[in-house]
Amino acid sequence: VSQDLVLSTMGRGFWILYNLLPLHEVSDEVAGSEVHLYEVRNPYRLYAARRFRDPGPDEPQYPNPGARVDYYLASEPSGEVRLEILNANGDVVRAFSSEQANSAIQFSDSIRMGNWSLAGAGTPQLPKTAGMHRFAWDLRHAGPWSQSLQQSGGNGPMVVPGLYQARLSVGSWSQVVSFEVLMDPRIEEEGTVTVANVQAQVKLSLDVRNALSDARLAVAKLDEAQANS
């Protein structure tokens, strides 16, 4: 059912194995590829439900909302594996890498973030071992910059519904697949919130993020200047 595997336990309940889309794409060509990026199922723009406890061993493990990006590596590459999420204008919204984040804080001459890219800030590391991998993007922009690597880039605003691309790069090889982030159908049915409303909300959130990043950078540079004086 919609690339999910649904199992019935003879009247006692249903179990669903989520998103088997890669199995529907298997072919001799895919199996013989050194690297392959699978199609991405269109995700819904949903907020994760709050959990007050971990599920028990017999309880279902519900996936968090987001886009699942599946890719295959026939062997572990020697260089970087990079995944970029692009919007309809071709701008990089989020970037993920197999390389470890640099622990050193690099300051620019400017007191403002300026053209600094937050797209890769605070992102989890991409796996690059041989085999199949499923990576989950939470549909969020990067959050505000922080001098702490553990906090930098976290909890950013969710992206606007619309068309996006996932671009996987390994060395000189790259592949792009398109997908659409869909509006929460419950919100669409109510009709009280439009895409234009969401766009305005996200723009304001990004403006606040950038202002907070500028403020934190200014404080960090003042601390650096004081330490070197």
Each model region followed by its residue ranges:
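Extracytoplasmic/secretory ectodomains and luminal regions
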Residues: 27-229
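Repeat-solenoid scaffold signature
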Residues: 1-29, 72-74, 80
